[in-house]
Amino acid sequence: MRNESERRAAARRRAEHRGRDAERRVAGWYAAQGFVVLAQRLRTAAGELDLVVADRTTLVFVEVKARNALRSAIESVAPRQRRRLVAAAAIVLAGQPDWGRAETRFDVVLLVGDDVHAIRDAFRADDP
């Protein structure tokens, strides 16, 4: 029992490390495009937002997925998770009204190996 528990804990630690590394890399990718990183791993009552970035006109809530294959990364953002991200974004905007911009979007960034695949405006707050 203990060995199984230890294996699960080790797997969680590896996943956590991989996720943090992916988020750092994606934050750098957005910064190189002129965005300012407003928050990383922002926790709300509705869930966690991996990244919140902005330029002068656009506020972007970013979900980062690191996977071994592109297909599994794309499929990893299910409708339930999208609803949670939208709810978390609403909480953030209510608490940080100065972050508001003319445009707000939700990006999903897939990190497969060293390749960054950004799906800009991957979904909208009013999507079913």
Curated annotation (Swiss-Prot):
Q: Which residues form a coiled coil?
A: none
Please give the Pfam families that the UniProt record associates with this protein: UPF0102 (PF02021)
Q: Which Gene3D superfamilies match?
A: 3.40.1350.10
SUPFAM superfamilies assigned to the protein according to its UniProt record, in alphabetical order: Restriction endonuclease-like
Q: Which GO terms describe its molecular function?
A: nucleic acid binding
Q: Which HAMAP family does the protein's record reference?
A: UPF0102 (MF_00048)
Family note = Belongs to the UPF0102 family.
Q: Record's PANTHER family?
A: UPF0102 PROTEIN YRAN (PTHR34039:SF1)
Q: What is this protein called?
A: UPF0102 protein Acry_2261
